[in-house]
């Protein structure tokens, strides 16, 4: 079988293939010595993997470039460049035009497209980042999103070096965030943020007391409220009715 011969050739060249039966390597792919391929890995088309990288398990790379020592787990990537020492996955989707810098991270349940992510920058989890340029040393909090499409055209987001975004920040493109800036949790960034500024979307929190008892009477939530209130009264030495 052709694939078995291809795999054997790479094994003899110093590539570790843990499970040849579930691994596919196209004849057009290139692997350096000391690469490790874990079960369920597909290395397709013109993908090139540098020395010391670990790919898999359950990973498909199509026309990708992988730097030395990178680790890619349970990921689908097409036409992506992954820098030396970077980590990707699990459950990441790297679409065409993704460039991840050295030591960077694209984490769990992250989708990227047409984006440059600088050295050491991290998009750790639950994010969509498309049509964006991200500087070095950036950290995007959980759930950060670049809203790049306005139903007519795609727009770019530019994020400077060492920016830190709070969880669930939405960058509404086109928008620029200056170096060292920060965003609060849940911020919707519609305007450019100057370097070193803190961007907030703040509205006063409003608590509607008694809403659950009035609108969800008899539910487990309402019963839990009653128990909590009774326990609070008891702890304060008040007489509990009923």
Language-model features, listed with the residues they occupy:
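Glycine-rich hexapeptide-repeat left-handed beta-helix
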Residues: 63-242
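Extended, small-residue-rich solenoid/repeat segments and analogous flexible loops
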Residues: 1-76, 82-87
